[in-house]
Amino acid sequence: AQTGTGKTAANLLPVLNQLSKGGYPEDAINCVIMSPTRELAQQIDQQMEGFSYFLPASSVAVYGGNDGVRFEQEKKGLTLGADVVIATPGRLISHLSLGYVDLSKVSFFILDEADRMLDMGFSDDIMQIVKYLPKERQTIMFSATMPAKIQQLAKTILNNPVEIKLAVSKPAEKIIQTAYICYERQKLGIIQSLFQDQTPERVIIFASSKLKVKEVTQAFKRMKL
């Protein structure tokens, strides 16, 4: 299903529902959710906190790019057996390599944005993590696209899987989609000319980074847009 269709909720809610019924090992990791980026891991963790607010389910987010204090906090959550572990592949492998993480009781293994993980080169990491998991488990892959490499991964780590596809959503009829092929230095000029032709009342502009957002904002102020 496409990005933004609720795939994360579609995996968190059923898992929490199952855990709330009981029958799963206490003080053990029961679910591992893999995320391609730290930002997505943080987002899933926030949603997890919201969905599980009134449930006796614990979670820990494990992702890179932090100091030693954060690493120790992750270690504590992993060794105490948080019900749900939300992790980026590289960071989880770092903990696994130190020998204190037990994934032998995991019942649910979820790959969120599996296509992005493969695009970022995490295929070998995923296969390495799978080796720590029990054979008797439910494995679920969520992906916006289904290229050949995703289908191959599914055949490798899934057992007789069911494939569910949601129809591709289309923009409203009144929306006009246009693509401009240009150099980086030409982008602001193109936007300026578009605004001069027809000044819009409301605009949403997406940028690739926080720094780029600041640069674009400053440029627009200079242009008095």
How should each PLM-predicted stretch be described?
Residues 1-225:
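Conserved helicase RecA-like core
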